[in-house]
Amino acid sequence: MSLKHRYRETIRPKLLKDLGLSNIHQVPKVVKVNVNRGLGEAAQNSKTLEASLSEMATITGQKALVTRAKKAIAGFKIREGMPIGCTVTLRGERMYAFLERLINLALPRIRDFRGVSPKSFDGRGNYTLGVKEQLIFPEISFDKIDTIRGMDITIVTSARSDEEGRALLKALGFPFRST
């Protein structure tokens, strides 16, 4: 059973009852997943950016968008418009497929993994997770990468509070660390 189907059939009715909501449309849901990688060295080395774009496309199944510097910063040797990273916004079926792979395959492959931090909510029910290395995803082979780079994964939900967001992600299967 896919994650989307499981959400619709079992998780949503359970959350409706647990959160004490009156309407099925009030139940929090995952709106989008944003996968972001900042590459400061991409301004000097274009191969870094190309490798990162192909890795992100392999991991997410969607072409990555190049993020560019909004203004020049002399201390970082960056001019306006220089490429400084890449990002992918996932919605719909690809989003659920990515979340399923993240929860069931990627997170358990992290070294010394004891669960994700329950404190990374932003106050509005959205969750941000930092990944230190791209090797946790089974699509990336160790031989094909030049350097180990991390990425930020933001899960945007329709939840109105952190408690609702935490309840949603816990129901989806996120392994939160007990504090």
UniProtKB/Swiss-Prot annotation:
InterPro entries: Ribosomal_uL5, Ribosomal_uL5_bac-type, Ribosomal_uL5_C, Ribosomal_uL5_CS, Ribosomal_uL5_dom_sf, Ribosomal_uL5_N. GO terms for cellular component: ribonucleoprotein complex; ribosome. GO terms for molecular function: rRNA binding; structural constituent of ribosome; tRNA binding. SUPFAM superfamilies: RL5-like (SSF55282). GO terms for biological process: translation. Keywords: Ribonucleoprotein, Ribosomal protein, RNA-binding, rRNA-binding, tRNA-binding. Part of the 50S ribosomal subunit; part of the 5S rRNA/L5/L18/L25 subcomplex. Contacts the 5S rRNA and the P site tRNA. Forms a bridge to the 30S subunit in the 70S ribosome. NCBIfam families: PRK00010.1. PANTHER family: 60S RIBOSOMAL PROTEIN L11-RELATED. Belongs to the universal ribosomal protein uL5 family. This is Large ribosomal subunit protein uL5. It comes from Prochlorococcus marinus (strain MIT 9211). The gene is rplE.
